[in-house]
Amino acid sequence: HKEYRRQRQMCIRDRKDKTCCFSGHRNLGKYDYNYVYQRTKDIITLLAENGIVYFGTGGAIGFDTIAAKAVLAVREIYPQIKLILVLPCEDQARYWKAENVEEYNKIKEQADKIRYVSKSYYDGCIHKKNRHMVDCSSICVCFLTDFESGTAVTVDYAIEKGLDVINVADEFDDVL
């Protein structure tokens, strides 16, 4: 825990103003995948053009995967940006379907940095991962449609900590 705290303090001091985190649902509901992906990519592009360098995502199925893929696409145009995977545990994908594991591993291979909150899963490791990402960021890009969810808890924490929050599910003109 001591090393984790030291790293956390270091990231807050050194990179917070250049860092964006992502939080979102695993299920997109009525939203079209390509629509969410394109909007996320557009927001990342705007952030990259305005000095955001580090983009942290939790690597889960759903919006985390969309965000990671969007960062990788934007990185082709803005090579200075970095994809940071902040994963709750090393065995996160243990019970996933094969196609999800394959996509997850491809993203891990292309990430600039991978940080694990814990070696193995325990109650609370996802919550700890979410708080770590918020604590190290100045902006939170989210996909929030269910206000009684873990994503809502993370976004509320981001607001409490003073982060700018951009919800991909909001009207695009209102966001930018």
Task: Map each language-model feature to its residues.
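Acidic/glycine-enriched connector segments
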Residues: 13-176
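Single conserved hydrophobic/aromatic residue that forms the stacking wall/gate
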Residues: 1-12
